Design a protein with these regions (language model features):
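Pyridoxal 5′-phosphate
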Residues: 3-304
Length: 304
């Protein structure tokens, strides 16, 4: 179950069980589309509302504004652990603490954090946590959804099919216990083995070692790029992680990406499935360099 499907599962099943017309979901302005669109689909179907946490020019969430978004109709918070466009590491423990003070559960989108540093869902105390396999060197089309039993037990199945049933008749179907009631059909056991291999690989390297290496590369890249005339860097919060996004002068982001590609440098251009972030900064797209455990300072120098 990859991250997008995981968030769709939570959105559909949680809303079915716990939300009614007029209820509210809190998300942030820096969300990937996969943590916006599923909630919008539910909003259109059920008449619920999305409230959005704003951010400042550095890419830091406005936590005071976040606290003020809660009302008696707020039912769930769904936020990115790390922004895929800005590299901002959001204070998810604080986000969860505030939400829990209001009796509201939290889903954390960990797709951009899980490959880059160690995650402890019990320490974060989030109610749901989702990440993708391909971001952590595993296969595409698979990922993980963690959820607390107290919520998952009360949520109805998201999809129907074989394997997730206890018994079936034309009068009534009963469902298996967790996690099987959410796993309809034959699982992709090949991808499961691939993801397990990837997780064992990064665990053997040590997530703290990976984090230290990538943070060093990120800081070095930010400093080097800042020396270039006309450089505009996006996401300048302290402690940002493994993502450097930028524009240079009046050069279109697609042109910059094409030029770098001809030099053998792989970057991504466009809105990065985060159009509200582009709107926040008044741009159509940006160039994004992202770092993995295999990158080096020499490659940063080649980019610069």
């Amino acid at each position: 179950m990859y991250k997008r499907q995981s968030i769709n599962l939570v959105a559909a099943s949680f809303c079915e069980a716990f939300m009614a017309e007029g209820d509210e979901v809190i998300v942030s302005v820096m969300e990937h589309h996969s943590n916006i669109v599923p909630w919008q689909l539910q909003a259109a179907k059920r008449g619920i509302a999305l409230k959005v946490i704003p951010m400042d020019d550095s890419g830091k969430l406005d936590m005071q504004a976040y606290e003020q978004l809660f009302s008696e109709r707020t039912k769930i918070v769904s936020v990115a652990h790390v922004s895929n466009t800005l590299g901002t590491v959001n204070p998810v423990k604080e986000i969860v603490r505030i939400a829990h003070e209001h009796g509201v559960p939290v889903l954390v989108d960990g797709a951009q954090s899980t490959p880059h540093f160690a995650i402890d869902v019990q320490s974060i105390d989030c109610d749901f946590f989702a990440f993708s396999g391909h971001k952590i060197y595993g296969p595409t089309g698979i990922g993980v959804l963690y959820g607390k039993e107290e919520w998952l037990d009360r949520m109805p199945p998201y999809q129907g099919g074989g394997e997730m049933i206890e018994s079936v008749s034309f009068e009534k179907t009963t469902f298996e216990k967790l996690p099987f009631k959410f796993e309809a059909g034959t699982p992709d056991y090949v991808a499961t083995h691939g993801l397990a291999t990837a997780l064992n690989y990064v665990s053997a390297l040590g997530m703290d070692n990976i984090a230290a290496h990538e943070r060093e590369l990120t800081d070095y890249c930010m400093k080097r790029l800042a020396e270039i005339d006309g450089m505009r860097l996006f996401g300048t919060t302290e402690g940002k992680d493994a993502v450097v996004s930028f524009l240079v002068g009046d050069i279109h982001h697609l042109d910059m990406g094409t030029l770098l590609d001809r030099l053998g440098i792989a970057v991504r251009t466009g809105h990065h499935c985060a159009q509200p972030v582009m709107d926040r900064f008044g741009i159509q797209g940006m160039v994004r360099a992202s770092f993995g455990l295999y990158n080096t300072k020499e490659e940063v120098d080649a980019l610069v």
